[in-house]
Amino acid sequence: VEVISATSDQMFKDFMPYSKHPELPVFDGELLMDVHGTGCYTSQAAMKLYNRQNEVLANAAENAAVAADWLGTATYPLNTLTDAWKRFIVHQFHDDLTGTSIPRAYEFSWNDELISLKQFAGVLTSSVSGVASQLDTRVKGTPVILHNAHSFPVTDLVEVVLDMPKSPKGVTVYDEKGKKVATQMLSYENGKARVLIAASVPASGYAVYDVREGG
C-alpha cells in the first residue's frame, strides 16, 4: 500500500481527463451505497443545512469563547455550549440527519437545530464583543472591528453600516498599519452609510480599520 499526502482534489486531477479512463462508472441520479440509501443524500435538505450551520457556528463559538476566557473578557459558557452541542448532535444519526425519518419528526428536529443555532450565535456574539472591547480603537475616524471565525486568514469584501449625521462626499479607510485600503461608498440613507471595505483578517483573529469621511 502506498500512502500519498495530497490535497482532496489530487485524486481527480490524477484521473482527468475522464476519457482516458472508460473503466470508471457513470452515476446518474442518487449515489447509492451498494443497494440502499436512495434519497439519503438529498432528502430533508433543510435538516442537512441546519446541521452544517450548527457545526460551523459551534466551532466559531468555541474558538471565540476560549479566547475571551483566556484574555479575561468573558467566562467560558460551559453549560450553554454543552446544552447546544447535545441538542443538535443527537440528530446526527440514521434516520434523522439522513432524511429518512417520518415527516412529523422533523418538526421537532428543526426546532432543536434552530435553538442550538441561537445559542451558538449568542456565545459567539458575547465572546467577540468581550475581546473587541479590549482592542485599541484609537483612530482618527470611526473604528470598525472585524472578526474572522475561520482557522485561516481571510481577505474579502466586507459591508459595514456606519452612523453618520450627514451624507459624506466619500469615505477613506485605513488598516492598522495606516495603509489605505480599497473601499466604496454604497449608499446613504437616514443617517446610515453603507460602506464596502476590502479587508484582511488573520485566522481566528481581529482587525481594526479606520473609516474617515472624505475621498
Describe the residue ranges of each PLM region.
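Catalytic-domain carbohydrate-binding cleft regions of carbohydrate-active enzymes
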Residues: 1-146, 156, 167-186, 190-207
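NTP-handling and nucleic-acid-processing catalytic cores
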Residues: 157-161
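Noncatalytic alpha-helical scaffolds and linker/capping helices
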Residues: 147-151
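Short, hydrophobic/aromatic-enriched beta-strand segments in well-ordered soluble domains
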Residues: 207-215
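Active/binding-pocket-proximal capping segment
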Residues: 163-165
